[in-house]
Regions:
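N-terminal secretory signal peptides and thylakoid transit peptides that target proteins
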Residues: 1-19
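Short alpha-helical interface patches
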Residues: 6, 25, 223-227
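Alpha-helix C-terminal capping segments
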Residues: 12, 61-67, 221-223
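C-terminal segment of classical bacterial N-terminal signal peptides
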Residues: 22-28
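Active-site-proximal cofactor/substrate-binding loop regions of enzyme domains
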Residues: 30-105, 109
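Short, conserved sequence motifs used for protein processing/export or organelle targeting and
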Residues: 88-108, 120-256
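A conserved catalytic-core signature of glycosyltransferases
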Residues: 112
Length: 256
């Protein structure tokens, strides 16, 4: 969906991250480091609960989120909040991220739903074949990945480690995301009035940790606020919203 001048989108610093102290069991760290030939690759969905075109893309992102070769993140934009329903997960920072991608990818406008694939291309997500084609293109362009190794200690801090990687003089941004794995929201007004909307991997906290020069490095991130039902991801991409060159995720164990 598009709007006069700019389309329906949502932003980054999402509110209400759960309080610290809850018991949380992460997936085994040994399963996390990946062979560089295996990805993962990043899929970022820009969406809004106020847009009636978005629910099918939200469901599709939920299926992509189950794949070990994909880091799937849902960013809720805020520019459709005026049309009858205020998305509880939206923020201006998310909208700013989408607009930055639009500039880099030379889009005339922003729209929802929009899936940005590994920072190299975009589509609505309605045609899954187009998304798979973009994923294939991402794999061809970036067969060797700067895949971060993620481990979380008993002190609640996330260790992020990157091996040396040839950046050819072009720096990269290392960004951290904390996300809720699923939300079901009854929508009382707006275009989706009366519907129960399911959203997946909803980003609640997003920050650029550093600008990286390609030398072996490590960082520590405070994740004491992490709760059951949440996950964390790290995205490494060419500076200023360029192509993604590596990413990884760490999620809680799911029983049953």
């Amino acid at each position: 969906m598009t709007s006069p001048g700019l389309s329906r989108r949502r932003s980054l610093l999402l509110g209400g991250v759960a309080a610290a102290g809850a018991a949380f069991t992460m997936a085994p760290a040994g399963a996390n480091p990946r062979n560089t030939a295996e990805g993962p690759w990043a899929v970022e969905l820009f969406t809004s609960q106020g847009c009636n075109s978005c629910p099918p893309a939200d469901v599709y992102l939920g299926s992509l989120a189950k794949r070990p070769d994909i880091v799937a993140l849902s960013f809720h934009i805020d520019y459709w909040d005026y049309i009858g329903w205020k998305d509880p997960f939206a923020s201006r920072a998310t909208t700013d991220r989408q607009r930055a991608y639009a500039r880099v990818l030379k889009q005339r406008y922003v729209y929802t739903p929009e899936m940005v694939i590994d920072g190299i291309g975009h589509d609505t997500g309605r045609d899954r074949g187009k998304i798979e084609a973009l994923l294939g293109e991402a794999q061809r362009r970036s067969p060797r990945r700067a895949t971060p190794e993620l481990t979380r200690g008993s002190d609640g801090r996330l260790a992020v480690r990157l091996a040396a990687f040839p950046l050819d003089g072009e720096p990269a941004d290392v960004a951290f995301a904390l996300y809720d794995r699923r939300h079901s929201t009854p929508v009382a007004s707006g275009e989706n009035q009366g519907r129960m909307l399911d959203n997946f991997n909803v980003v609640r906290r997003f920050e650029v940790l550093t600008r990286w020069d390609g030398a072996a490095a490590s960082w520590s991130v405070d994740t004491a606020d992490l709760q059951q039902g949440q996950g964390v991801a790290v995205i490494v991409q060419r500076a200023d919203h360029g192509p993604v060159i590596g990413c990884n995720k760490l999620e809680p164990m799911v029983s049953g």
